[in-house]
Amino acid sequence: MEPENREILLRGAEAFGIDLAEGAILAFDIYLRELLKWNQKINLTGIRTEKGVVIKHFLDSLSVCSHIPGHTSLLDVGSGAGFPGIPLKMVQTSLQVTLIDSVRKKVDFQKHIVRLLDLRGIEAVHGRVQEEEVVQEMVSRFDMTISRAFSDTATFLHLSHLLLKRGGMAIAMRGKTTEEDIQRLSKEEGRRYRLQKHVSFVLPFTNFERTILLFEKQ
């Protein structure tokens, strides 16, 4: 990792209340290098620069960290190249993380990173949360579900409902979201979920507005 990008990772993590130890920085460096290498042959991400990955994948993933308690069982829906689930596991080692994606090559990459970084308490699953077999395996299993790039918020909430424990939390990571849209979602989902919190912020080192929506299953 270039010194400039290392500094961006450190300062960006600090902005979210995370103090990255040297070992964590080295792990992120390995993740970064492997992602860029694999991405030359497999379309894992449209972001192809070190700086872009550090900001738009690593820091964006870490932005939700303070909303996830330790020892939480977390399902990352549509996890792609492992975001946000793998970075969250890297900094919150007590999490029990399940990654699920419908693209086998992306799941193969996730498994490669998990092995390379020797991460425990994390699994990568090839499948779709819409599939009956997946639902039967995962019904009422998770404290939290999270989605960063999977479908729209309403679809994510619908698919999460059976997989969450009662009182569990569905976390939607989204771009700029208006107050009107937030209130509309809250009203539409009122019978199944309660909007517990929503947080808007600007992603460090960018002008990108982001919104985190936390819905509690009723």
Spans of features found by a protein language model:
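Conserved glycine-centered beta->alpha loop in an early N-terminal alpha/beta scaffold
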Residues: 78
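Class I SAM-dependent transferase core
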Residues: 1-71, 75, 105-108, 112-122
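S-adenosylmethionine
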Residues: 94-98, 102-218
